């Protein structure tokens, strides 16, 4: 698990985290998260390896779809885990990956514009 691509966008001041979609039913399993780059980390606790640890926590941007309990926000955007590059003025190159019939991995870059609405993170530019 984890973040496959993390990119800082100077235009918005935020960090974009593209991940492979999760499968755990207790989580919203978004593919894309935006970390609010304008907020300082806050001290808080997490549980890791059955131990409670005090850490600095980052804040997700107040945008995107809300999880059922309202604690997590993100987008269902299947692209970007294999490439996410901020360009300027809200534009990004985002990888569309695929596997060929003979098993080779490929990608095609597409130019997107950041919109950050509740339903759509990006639109093709």
What are the roles of these predicted feature ranges?
Residues 1-74, 80-83:
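Loop/turn-rich, solvent-exposed surfaces of beta-rich toroidal or solenoidal domains
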Residues 11-13, 88-91:
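Short coil/turn segments that connect the beta-strands within blades of beta-propeller domains
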Residues 20-23, 90, 97-100:
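Residue-level signature of beta-propeller blades and closely related beta-rich strand-turn architectures
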Residues 77-78, 100:
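Beta-propeller domains
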Residues 85, 94-95:
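Conserved catalytic or regulatory cores that recognize and/or transform ribose-phosphate-containing ligands
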């Amino acid at each position: 698990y984890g973040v496959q691509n993390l990119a800082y966008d100077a235009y918005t001041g935020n960090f974009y985290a593209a991940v492979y979609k999760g499968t755990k039913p207790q989580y919203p399993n978004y593919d894309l998260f935006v970390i609010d780059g304008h907020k300082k980390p806050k001290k808080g606790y997490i549980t890791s390896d059955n131990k409670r640890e005090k850490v600095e926590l980052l804040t997700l941007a107040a945008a995107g779809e809300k999880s059922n309990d309202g604690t997590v926000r993100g987008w269902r955007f299947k692209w970007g885990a294999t490439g996410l590059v901020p360009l300027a003025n809200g534009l990004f190159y985002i990888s569309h990956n695929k596997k060929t019939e003979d098993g080779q991995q490929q990608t095609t870059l597409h130019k997107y514009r950041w919109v950050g609405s509740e339903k759509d993170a990006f639109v093709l530019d």
